[in-house]
A protein has these predicted regions:
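N-terminal signal peptide
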Residues: 2, 16-39
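Active-site neighborhood of phospho(di)ester-bond hydrolases with catalytic His/Asp-centered motifs
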Residues: 207-209, 275-282, 312-322, 428-432, ...
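Core catalytic region of metal-dependent phosphoesterases/phosphodiesterases
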Residues: 246-340
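Active-site-proximal segments of metal-dependent phosphoesterases and phosphodiesterases across multiple
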Residues: 391-411, 415-462
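Metal-dependent phosphoesterase/phosphodiesterase active-site architecture
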Residues: 28-143, 150-270, 275-278, 340-419, ...
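Short, surface-exposed basic-aromatic patches at helix termini and helix-loop junctions that form
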Residues: 308-310, 444-455, 473-483, 506
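Bacterial N-terminal signal peptides that target proteins for export
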Residues: 2-10
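Active-site environment of divalent metal-dependent phosphoester hydrolases
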Residues: 215, 285-288, 318-329, 393-395, ...
């Protein structure tokens, strides 16, 4: 996760839209009633672009939350501004003619170059980022954004229906409904998981996420550089009177140095018994405006080497984060071939995770190459499934082409879980982006799968948010019976929280094991203290059962924890401090904040707050 990707990529999309409008060829619409020749002169085109850009930024954000209606009036008010001298309304007919011109415009290389130049200028004029970032980010995303626009099957009618509403044309909804299919096999009755007998074998599972390693991190450098990522060797010294980047890390929009990464792994290796590792994505840094594929692959291989060094012979089960690709969030479906294909990343994962490290069996290769996901039988009766959650990523522009179960991943998940149920196996599911933050329709289908196979799925493990969280799946609104839990482990990179990692204790490898999560221990590094003393000291932050007064980590117990937080501010405040890993700089959380955070726990499905 990155502030840049969620906050500014919407602006980038808007910039490309406004550039297309600003550079369009003459369109045939004198006004909305009489067809004729209508031409925007150069000055008007430029003015229109600058006026539309902030609107389009807002509209992009609103569209993501499915509340764009107020912005339609704003657009018309902008277009009708007398200072533009256009004298017409951009209403339905005019919009359709304009979109036809857009289709023509993006087909030539010359137009692409012009789009890039003007988009960069608009970015600078609106001060979305500094000049260097504007120039680089537009070029970084140029091919993806324009290729998606070229391949997109939206007609001018659909575009204008989306912009102007259904009175103009039927809007396009890339979040439109689709459903996975389930085999005609009755769902088994769910029975409470019995606690293991005293002395039963257990396993220890390390969960690390969101490493965000920055090979350009430089202690003492400018930590307030004005760019999305600072503390880098090219940022120069800090301003007079301002502290430079800390030796072990910094909370001011900075990522993880190689020294901190090595220190983290060394500490874990020395102090923890680890049977296997869940690594839930986001290995590269947040410099998303100037990353290359070779940059990403270098980090991928480096992390594999580090884990093999510090944990020899220990299996690692990785999943792909949204930052693994270049550009960030770019995960085209299998049918996209050529330069824009994601084959380069999936082949590298096979090379690193199967051939080099032997973490995964060769049987994982087929689905890894298809869509970056796999399953593996870890022990008899226990299977791990690793999903590529970018198939539901709202910032993955390729989903504008086709968002219906990309690469057939969720239908594949149904088949894996059904086979596991039949074989009486238990399953842990790994992913990067929690389902509650993905496309609503993808998240809905995932929820249907969880509800159907709740007795088979004994744990879900995600990252992305950088925070220590959990989420609950309930059977239905009426009963409110918790049936499954999503664990979000937090990040190693400092981002309004101290670096940290988690170790789960799970029911172990023996006949009739439940393979359930029995407890988890959470460790953190007080970054402020580490920078002051130059002696990083990792500490136990909390143990779940003790901290939340739980008898087990079954879904029903997590449900009880949530109900306690609703009526007991002290209980919530404790959770909130863990949310930030005891970071001293966390903001206070008032009653509205508490309500929203508790609702977030109860919202395991994207856009569905019915359990709040």
């Amino acid at each position: 996760m990155a502030t840049f990707s969620t906050k500014r990529l919407a602006a980038l999309a808007a910039l490309f839209f406004c550039v297309v409008i600003a550079t369009c060829k003459p369109v045939t619409s004198a006004d909305v009633k009489t067809k004729g020749e209508y031409v925007l002169d150069e000055q008007t085109r430029s003015t229109l672009a600058y006026k539309l850009a902030p609107f389009l930024v807002s509209y992009s954000r609103a569209a993501a939350t499915r509340t764009p209606a107020p912005y339609v009036k704003m657009m018309n008010d902008i277009i009708r501004d007398p200072s533009l001298g256009i004298g017409v309304d951009i209403e339905c007919d005019a919009c359709k003619e304009l979109m036809k011109a857009v289709d023509d415009l993006i087909q030539t290389d010359e137009s692409r170059d012009l789009i890039v130049e003007i988009a960069a200028e608009v970015c600078k004029t609106l001060e979305i980022e500094d000049d260097r970032v504007c120039d680089l980010v537009v070029r970084e995303f140029k091919d993806e954004v324009i290729d998606v626009a070229t391949l997109h099957y939206l007609s001018p009618d659909q575009v204008c229906g989306t912009l102007l509403g259904p009175s103009c044309a039927i809007p396009y909804d890339y979040n439109s409904d689709w459903n996975v299919t389930f085999p005609n096999i009755p769902k088994p009755h769910m029975t409470p998981v019995q606690p293991p007998q005293p002395g039963s074998p257990t396993l220890r599972v390390l969960h690390i996420s969101d490493l965000h390693i920055d090979l350009m991190y430089e202690p003492g450098s400018n930590a307030e550089c004005g760019e999305p990522l600072c503390c880098r060797s090219n940022d120069g010294p800090p301003a007079p009177g301002t502290k430079g980047a800390g030796k072990w890390g910094d909370f001011r929009t900075c990522d993880v140095s190689l020294d901190l990464m090595k220190n983290t792994l060394e500490n874990i290796a020395k102090t923890q018994k680890v049977d296997f590792i869940y690594m839930t994505g986001d290995l590269p840094a947040h410099n998303v405006w100037n990353q290359t594929r070779s940059d990403q692959l270098k980090i991928l291989d480096m992390v594999t080497d580090l884990l093999m060094k510090y944990f020899p012979g220990v299996k690692v089960y990785p999943t792909l984060g949204n930052h693994e690709s270049a550009p960030v969030n770019s995960f085209p479906p299998e049918f996209i071939t050529g330069d824009q294909s994601e084959k380069w990343l999936y082949e590298a994962c096979v090379s690193s995770w199967i051939e080099k490290s032997d973490w995964l069996p060769k049987s994982a290769k087929e689905t890894m190459l298809r869509g970056g996901y796999y399953d593996v039988l870890v022990y008899p009766g226990f299977r791990v499934v690793s999903l590529n959650a970018n198939a539901g990523n709202t910032q993955n522009w390729w989903l504008r082409i086709n968002a219906t179960d990309p690469d057939a991943q969720l239908q594949w998940l149904v088949s894996v879980l059904q086979a596991a149920e039949t074989a009486k196996e238990k399953v842990h599911i790994l992913g990067h982006i929690p389902p509650s933050q993905n496309l609503a329709v993808w998240s809905k289908n995932y929820e249907l799968i969880v509800k159907r196979y709740a007795s088979t799925i004994t744990g879900q493990f995600f990252g992305h948010t950088h925070k220590d969280q959990f989420k609950i799946y309930y059977d239905n609104v009426t009963n409110r019976q918790p049936i499954n839990v999503v664990y979000v482990a937090g990040a190693i990179t400092p981002d309004t929280q101290n670096p940290g990692y988690r170790v789960y204790t799970i029911d172990g490898n023996y006949t009739k094991s439940s393979w359930a999560v029995l407890d988890h221990d959470n460790y953190y590094l007080n970054l402020t203290e580490a920078n002051l003393t130059d002696k990083p000291k990792w500490r136990l932050e909390y143990t779940a059962k003790k901290a939340f007064n739980m008898t087990s980590l079954q879904p029903s117990e997590w449900g009880r924890v949530v109900e306690e937080m609703k009526k007991n501010e002290t209980a919530f405040d404790q959770y909130y401090s863990y949310f930030h890993r005891l970071w001293e700089g966390r903001s206070p959380c008032d009653s509205s904040c508490r309500q929203n955070m508790i609702c977030d726990i109860e919202t395991a499905r994207s856009g569905d707050s019915s359990f709040c």
